[in-house]
Amino acid sequence: MGKRILVVDDEDVIRKFLRIHLAKLGYEVREAADGEQAMEQLRKDDFDLLICDIMMPKKNGWEVIKEVKSNPKTKEMPVIVLTAKNEDSDMFKGYDLGVNFYMNKPFTKTQLLYGLKLMFDDTPEEVRA
């Protein structure tokens, strides 16, 4: 079974794009439309990577990341931020919270593949190329 990735974004089109492309690469993808759904899934299941938007209803991405990084069960899980917040201060805040890779919207498939390459040593051949 491939690595398990939780994609958290309130935009359906973003989640669908990620689900399709990540599944083609052999990853198992779960989705959440907001931070509360994300935390519920993280309590129930184990994931190898979190891809998280910042600006979401109910619980924003910063709150999700703080909880993930403060929980002994999930603190080592890598996090990719995917957001329209493209100020340097936002990026620095993410890295201060323990984010591993920061992608601005709109993003490209190449940027996504590069982020996966950084997160996993055993990436699919398409990602390593």
Stretches found by the model and what they are:
Residues K16-K24:
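Charged docking surfaces used in two-component/phosphorelay signaling
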Residues L6, E31-L49:
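Acidic, metal-coordinating helix/loop segments flanking the phosphotransfer/catalytic sites
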Residues K117-A129:
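The C-terminal output helix
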Residues F107-K117:
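C-terminal output helix
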